[in-house]
A protein has these predicted regions:
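Secreted peptidase-domain scaffold signal
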Residues: 49-50, 80-153
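Mature extracellular/periplasmic domains of secretome proteins
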Residues: 1-4, 65, 85-89
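Hydrolase catalytic cores
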Residues: 4-78
């Protein structure tokens, strides 16, 4: 659902040493740490005081995925982004996920804690509704853009 740096990350190794490691262990450790920070924010922010434990868990995912950044495919010169099938919502952003006053939800999503449109592989058109919830006293304006994404075949 998210991407994080996982290549040549400085990691702890046996014997009180450090070395550059690559793989999902490095990427998942970063996402887990950022998720813990978002969970702390949701647990302590008065804006979420009335939420149930399940709702707070969903908020963590909503903030993580809703503030992630699309990743451009470095093998292409046209700036095309990687498909969400490869990188999920995009590159996780710790600062945005822990400070954003707005989080998205998708009405009718297969999993309410995942702000994404489940399009499947059908050939029909799709309609979905994205709600943006503002937990601050400041108004925010967003512009919706779109880009068709596909896998390199």
């Amino acid at each position: 659902e998210l991407a994080a740096p996982g290549g040549r990350v400085m990691s702890a190794t046996p014997g009180n040493n450090y070395d550059r490691q690559s793989g999902t262990a490095e990427a998942s450790a970063q996402v887990a740490g950022i998720a813990a920070l978002v969970r702390q924010r949701v647990a302590t922010d008065p804006a979420f005081a009335g939420k149930s434990a399940a709702e707070k868990n969903a908020l963590v995912s909503n903030f993580l995925m809703g503030t992630a950044h699309p990743l451009a495919d470095a093998t292409r010169e046209d700036g095309t982004f990687y498909s969400p099938r490869r990188v999920g919502a995009g590159l996780v952003d710790a600062v945005a996920a822990t400070t954003s006053p707005v989080y998205p939800t998708v009405v009718g999503a297969a999993d309410p804690s995942r702000p994404k449109a489940d399009l499947g592989d059908g050939t029909q058109g799709w309609t979905f509704q994205v709600n943006l919830t503002n937990v601050s006293d400041t108004a925010h304006t967003y512009s919706l853009g779109g880009q068709v994404l596909s896998e390199n075949v």
